[in-house]
Design a protein with these regions (language model features):
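Extracytoplasmic gate region of multi-pass secondary transporters
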Residues: 15-16, 200-256, 347-352
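Helix-breaking motifs and short loop linkers at transmembrane-helix boundaries and internal kinks
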Residues: 27, 59, 80-86, 114, ...
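Conserved MFS/SLC helix-loop-helix module at the cytosolic interface between two early adjacent transmembrane helices
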Residues: 46-85
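Helix-to-loop junctions at the C-terminal end of transmembrane segments
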Residues: 47-59, 254-268
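Cytoplasmic membrane-interface "Motif A"-like loop-to-helix N-cap segments
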Residues: 57-67, 263-278
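Cytoplasmic helix-loop-helix junction between adjacent transmembrane helices
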Residues: 90-129
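Helix-loop-helix hairpin linking two adjacent transmembrane segments in secondary transporters
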Residues: 124-175
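Juxtamembrane intracellular "pre-TM" segments in multi-pass secondary transporters
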Residues: 174-207, 406-417
């Protein structure tokens, strides 16, 4: 199960470490390079809801196998593409296969584990999947620098074929069934499931949580982090790969902790999301405000903050799971998963356009160019923050109306525990 997501993340992030090589190979500027990743994410995001509907009908196994083979085809095409057209088609295939993988893996979790363990297992799934970023940051980057472009991407394609075979041999949709199919698809059923999932404010809270928490880390890992560190901050390729590896390892360490917190404090999940968003904003603020190039220690702080975004965005899927019945879980999960990738593709495109505007389309960036371009993330984050605060209010009202559960203000709860009084300080 997890291996499918590991390889999907490898495919998804492969362009990030190959960004500078891709500019040389295809003779394109930052805007055109960004368009590769934007198109990949656009395909991914556009397919989330259709894939979610198909997932509820056909089950996880079929979609995971199909997704792995489609991504493998995309990477094989990328290996031998010598022009922009081939590269664009390759990233479209990668985005399409990727769209079929993650939510299919997530749907397996409640089928195999009791409900009380789902938050932690969901985080562990995301944690293991991030090994794909390690594979792109280290061995794939080493293959690019050594054996070359074609060998690197053929190797990535081979990994996709291997995962498809492994899933066919070992994976089951549930302990009871190898392939679990839902009811036959009809237009009325599709429309009803989609409308009901969207109408629930808990689903939309999940979408905005995913939108806001995920995109800074995705933008960094998928395409702009490596060029920012190398061309902007002046790090060596090895040092940049090291920071990307730190990004992955930090996310892996944070995931289980966040899962336990969600499990123990289900009514305070949104505050975890808001805290992670604040960490992302402060991390970038420190780097952008630093005069000139930031020292390595400051860049480490940025990477540590951004690494929390991936595990934090997984809380959005918990909102989808707990606010929707099992028969439309795939649809609700697909809606939530659209959020972070829409935000990411908008940010990636805007950063590329700003860099091109400042350098005339040449790959001659300096740190000032990157600082101006990266600051656009604050505008996107502000939109997401507004969405979270509004839908949280609506979701809490719905929770009280449907289940009689009232979420008390956090400040009131903390005040009762003595956090805002001298009594608490005296006890510490």
């Amino acid at each position: 199960m997890a291996s499918a997501y590991v390889v999907a993340v490898l495919h998804r992030t492969s362009l990030g470490v190959a960004g500078l090589d891709a500019q040389v190979r295809f003779d394109v500027g930052a805007g055109a390079l960004a368009s590769f990743a934007v198109l990949q994410l656009l395909v991914y995001a556009a397919l989330q809801v259709p894939v979610g509907l198909l997932l509820d009908r056909f089950g996880s196994l079929r979609l995971i196998v199909g997704g792995a083979l489609v991504m493998a085809a995309g990477q094989a095409l990328m290996a031998f593409a010598d022009g922009v057209t081939g590269a664009v088609l390759a990233r479209v295939l990668v985005g399409a296969g990727d769209a079929m993988t993650f939510i299919s893996v997530l749907r397996l979790v409640p089928q195999w584990f009791p409900a009380r363990r789902v938050p932690v297992v969901t985080q562990l799934t995301g944690l293991v999947g991030q090994l794909g970023q390690v594979l792109s940051a280290v061995p794939l980057a080493a293959l690019l620098a050594g054996a070359g472009w074609s060998t690197a991407f053929v190797s990535a394609a081979a990994a996709g074929v291997f995962v498809a075979i492994l899933a066919l041999v070992a994976l089951r949709d549930s302990p009871q069934q190898r392939i679990a199919s839902g009811d036959a698809l009809t237009m009325s059923r599709l429309g009803a499931d989609l409308a009901n999932a969207w109408r629930h404010p808990g689903t939309r809270l999940g979408l905005w949580s995913h939108f806001t928490a995920q995109f800074p880390g995705t933008v960094f890992a998928l395409i702009w982090g490596y060029p920012f560190l190398v061309a902007g901050e002046g790090l060596s390729r090895g040092a940049a790969s090291g920071l990307l590896t730190l990004f992955v390892l930090t996310g892996m360490a944070a995931g289980p902790l966040i899962g336990v917190l969600v499990q123990r404090h289900p009514l305070r999940r949104s505050w975890l999301v808001l805290g992670i968003i604040a960490a992302n904003a402060l991390g970038w603020g420190l780097v952008l405000a630093w005069p000139g190039r930031a020292p390595l220690a400051v860049l480490v702080v940025l990477v540590l903050a951004l690494a929390l975004g991936g595990p934090g965005s997984m809380i959005g899927f918990e909102f989808a799971r707990t606010f929707n019945p099992p028969n439309r879980l795939g649809t609700a999960t697909g809606i939530v998963n659209v959020g972070g990738f829409v935000a990411s593709l908008v940010a990636i495109l805007l950063i590329g356009l700003i860099l091109d505007a400042r350098t005339g389309g040449q790959a001659t960036y300096d740190i000032a160019d990157f600082k101006i371009a990266m600051s656009v993330q604050y505008a996107i984050g502000a939109i997401g923050l507004i969405g979270i605060l509004r839908t949280r209010k609506l979701a809490r009202r719905r929770l009280a109306a449907d289940h009689g559960v009232t979420v008390r203000p956090l400040r009131e709860v903390l005040a009762e525990k003595g956090w805002f009084s001298g009594e608490r300080i005296g006890k510490s």
